[in-house]
Amino acid sequence: MFWRKSMKKSAWGLVDAFFDKYDLVDHHIHSYNDFVSNRIQEIIDTSEPIELEQGKYRVETGKVSIEKPFIKEADGSKSKIYPTEARLRNLTYSAHMSLEMRLLKEGGPETEFEKVYIGELPVMLKSEICHLHGLSRKELMEKGEDPADPGGYFIVNGSERSIVTMEEIAPNKIILERIGEEDENRARAIVTSIRSGFRARISLEYRKPRKTGVFLRISFPYVPGEIPLVILLRALGLATDQEIITSISDDFNYQMIAADDIQVSLDRLNLNKKEMKELDEEDRREYLIRSAIKYIGNRVAKGMTEDYRIKRAEDVIDRYLLPHIGTEPEKRLEKATYLAEMTEMLLQVISGERRPHDKDHYTNKRLRVSGDLMEDLLRVAFTSLSRDMSYQLERSLARGKEPSVKQAVRSDVLTENLKHAIATGNWVGGRAGVSQLLDRTSYMGTLSHMRRVVSPLSRSQPHFEARDLHPTQFGKICPNETPEGPNCGLVKNLALLAKISEGSDASEVEEVIKMGVVN
């Protein structure tokens, strides 16, 4: 009996220790802090540069600075604004963002950077740029706040809005699945490749052709329909039949499937065999690669000139095919190797050597919290600001005026983009309900809302397996708290002691691997 009491006391001691260190909404606040500290600057640094009159003028950007929330009164005076005041006056609790900019003229002197106000960023309560950050219980009460309030939400036009955690399939990871009826023996390998906010879904499918056709077909953004995999591998630099076959697998049966596809696809490339015989080995390689690129060009830019078709096909391959590997032409062979490995894995599923992935396994899922979703939103909003700025500068030049960066920036473009998305929940990429009105029915209801996890799957479809409780959710997702009705199993809640880990920088991981750390 004493032993049981002792164990119970120790268990609650551990729970207390956990909450002394972590808060229930830490995942939102830490993610937003990272977004403010690192990702905003990264978005600005990686955005397309603004160039005018074919490079005669160029806008250069520097460091971004964010001030803590303040308000300008009618008499022109500035004063700090706290969340309580924003709620009572139906205001948006937001921070002023300024960006260092300068306009460079070709052949002209280098000008100094000037600070330009670019818009307002909605501030998450209790984040690093919030006035409530680091305040004691007594100070919070003096500012009209509930000291037990967790924070982690926004105030837009006086309304409290919470960004819900979104559950998605893990990016940049090969997911193998069987499709269709069992007797069809069809399978698919999918990769959701993500780089700088751009999402490219690459789907490689194996299916038996009805008459004559290829077994392996691939689809990726900006290329209509499906194209034979072997043609894409050739376009990526695996010029000869032998290179394609050996890169896919050492297994003879898999090599035969690739050989059959090569034979069928050669007819589609319209090769001039007489011309090929006269070429030396290096020129023959170039000819085969160019023919494959031409085939893709006919899909992406039908009816255009040959040079444009080739240029457009190369651009699509570099930018939209597996962008997480890289967007430079030098990365094409790496992409070919990745696709070849993906093909072998797919063929192993077809032959029964490998089991398909369980899409509902939590290893194959990732949770996107406030910082990740705000990053997507700001990237699109900043692109809109850049386009508007480019238009304003072009107008100034057309009127014969000397362009000015300060006059070209319309701060309401960025502000309205961010405010509208958080106020309505309509996010970039056509997603709805990403931000919701914070549940204030009870304190427990508020905490529950802040720890909600939402699946993007359609509510009108059965999705029995996705709605089921999966063994890998143990300790991560609450097995009990899910609504009844169409949202059952698709709207979940984090377990009490669950903590969301943050993704690390890929370059740091590569450095560790180079040092010899395997696992």
From Swiss-Prot:
<dbReference type="InterPro" id="IPR015712">
    <property type="entry name" value="DNA-dir_RNA_pol_su2"/>
</dbReference>
<comment type="subunit">
    <text>Part of the RNA polymerase complex.</text>
</comment>
<dbReference type="GO" id="GO:0005737">
    <property type="term" value="C:cytoplasm"/>
</dbReference>
<dbReference type="GO" id="GO:0003677">
    <property type="term" value="F:DNA binding"/>
</dbReference>
<dbReference type="InterPro" id="IPR007642">
    <property type="entry name" value="RNA_pol_Rpb2_2"/>
</dbReference>
<keyword id="KW-0808">Transferase</keyword>
<dbReference type="Pfam" id="PF04563">
    <property type="entry name" value="RNA_pol_Rpb2_1"/>
</dbReference>
<protein>
    <recommendedName>
        <fullName>DNA-directed RNA polymerase subunit Rpo2N</fullName>
        <ecNumber>2.7.7.6</ecNumber>
    </recommendedName>
</protein>
<keyword id="KW-0240">DNA-directed RNA polymerase</keyword>
<dbReference type="InterPro" id="IPR007645">
    <property type="entry name" value="RNA_pol_Rpb2_3"/>
</dbReference>
<dbReference type="GO" id="GO:0000428">
    <property type="term" value="C:DNA-directed RNA polymerase complex"/>
</dbReference>
<keyword id="KW-0804">Transcription</keyword>
<dbReference type="Pfam" id="PF04561">
    <property type="entry name" value="RNA_pol_Rpb2_2"/>
</dbReference>
<comment type="function">
    <text>DNA-dependent RNA polymerase (RNAP) catalyzes the transcription of DNA into RNA using the four ribonucleoside triphosphates as substrates. The Rpo2 subunit (Rpo2N and Rpo2C in this organism) is implicated in DNA promoter recognition and in nucleotide binding.</text>
</comment>
<dbReference type="GO" id="GO:0006351">
    <property type="term" value="P:DNA-templated transcription"/>
</dbReference>
<dbReference type="InterPro" id="IPR007644">
    <property type="entry name" value="RNA_pol_bsu_protrusion"/>
</dbReference>
<dbReference type="Pfam" id="PF04565">
    <property type="entry name" value="RNA_pol_Rpb2_3"/>
</dbReference>
<keyword id="KW-0963">Cytoplasm</keyword>
<dbReference type="GO" id="GO:0032549">
    <property type="term" value="F:ribonucleoside binding"/>
</dbReference>
<dbReference type="InterPro" id="IPR037034">
    <property type="entry name" value="RNA_pol_Rpb2_2_sf"/>
</dbReference>
<comment type="similarity">
    <text>Belongs to the RNA polymerase beta chain family.</text>
</comment>
<keyword id="KW-0238">DNA-binding</keyword>
<keyword id="KW-0548">Nucleotidyltransferase</keyword>
<dbReference type="GO" id="GO:0003899">
    <property type="term" value="F:DNA-directed RNA polymerase activity"/>
</dbReference>
